[in-house]
Structures are given as structure tokens and as C-alpha cells.
From Swiss-Prot:
Single strand-specific metallo-endoribonuclease involved in late-stage 70S ribosome quality control and in maturation of the 3' terminus of the 16S rRNA. Belongs to the endoribonuclease YbeY family. Keywords: Cytoplasm, Endonuclease, Hydrolase, Metal-binding, Nuclease, Ribosome biogenesis, rRNA processing, Zinc. This is Endoribonuclease YbeY. The gene is ybeY. It comes from Geobacillus kaustophilus (strain HTA426). Its main location: cytoplasm.
Length: 156
């Protein structure tokens, strides 16, 4: 099971060790969710100004947020699914605010790595179609997140 992850750190604040941990977390999540071999995802680390602009432009919310996910494989109601010849899926993009992650880690009383891992896994599950719009959806999604994080010792 291999997932290809492209990382871009626009903040120059994320260490190689932290990126490696996120890579392992997302590979574990992909394996647990039976993501096709060779699937691709990008993870970009940004500052609050950049994520605020993205949140405003794409969600109509003019405020910084912690993580945004942009799924590339979603089909609209009138779109037809075209099956490629064994083409691995491009799942989409995850954008994480490093200042927000640091702020939330301090507020929740856990490590920056735990918060960074949580946001990466949270964004990844959104790319796979999970949501938390209802209590039941939230229960399922958050249980999956906690399970994956616990496997790496990233508990609260």
C-alpha cells in the first residue's frame, strides 16, 4: 500500500521529522480506509493570512481556520464517472495553518505534533468523503481520527 504525498511548507516551520510523522499517519489512514495503491494527495503548510484568503474565497468565511480540504475526485450530480485504465486517484489537497495548529495545541494542552497530526488526518478523511455535519457523522469521523492518532501515540 503506497500513497504519494507532496508536501509544501510555505512557513519553513515544519521539521523533516514532523513531515515524516504526517506521512506515516496518512499512509496508515489510507491503508485502514482501503485507498487504492498509488493514490496522491498534497499537504501544504501556510500562515493565517494565506488560509484566511482561501477560506474567504472558497467557503465565504473571512477568518483564518485550522485546516481546509479540497477533494479532486468529487463528482457533481450531473457528472459521469469515467474509469481510467488503472489510474490511481488524485484525492486532493490539504492545507494546514501552522499558527492555528500551534494556538490550538496550546489551548488544548497537547503537543504541536499531536495537533498537526490531528489536522492532517482530519483533512485526509474529508478528502475520502467523511464529514461531521451530524452527530452520527461526527462520531464516526472523530473515532477514526482518534484511532489513527493513538496508533502513533498522539493522544490528548
Amino acid at each position: 500500500m503506497t500513497i504519494h504525498i507532496d508536501f509544501l511548507d510555505e512557513t519553513n516551520e515544519v521539521t523533516a521529522e514532523q513531515i515524516e510523522t504526517i506521512e506515516r499517519l496518512l499512509a496508515e489512514a489510507a491503508a485502514l480506509e482501503n485507498v487504492p495503491d498509488g493514490a496522491e494527495v498534497s499537504v501544504t503548510f501556510v500562515d493565517n493570512e494565506r488560509i484566511r484568503a482561501m477560506n474567504r474565497d472558497y467557503r465565504g468565511k473571512d477568518a483564518p481556520t485550522d485546516v481546509l480540504s479540497f477533494a479532486l475526485e468529487e463528482e457533481g450530480e450531473e457528472e459521469v464517472h469515467i474509469v481510467g485504465a488503472d489510474m490511481p486517484p488524485v484525492l486532493g489537497d490539504i492545507v494546514i495553518s501552522i499558527p492555528k495548529a500551534k494556538e490550538q495545541a496550546a489551548a488544548y494542552g497537547h503537543s504541536f505534533m499531536r495537533e498537526l497530526g490531528f489536522l492532517a488526518v482530519h483533512g485526509f478523511l474529508h478528502l475520502l468523503g467523511y464529514d461531521h455535519g451530524t452527530e452520527e457523522e461526527e462520531r464516526v469521523m472523530f473515532a477514526k481520527q482518534e484511532d489513527i492518532l493513538a496508533r502513533f501515540g498522539l493522544t490528548r
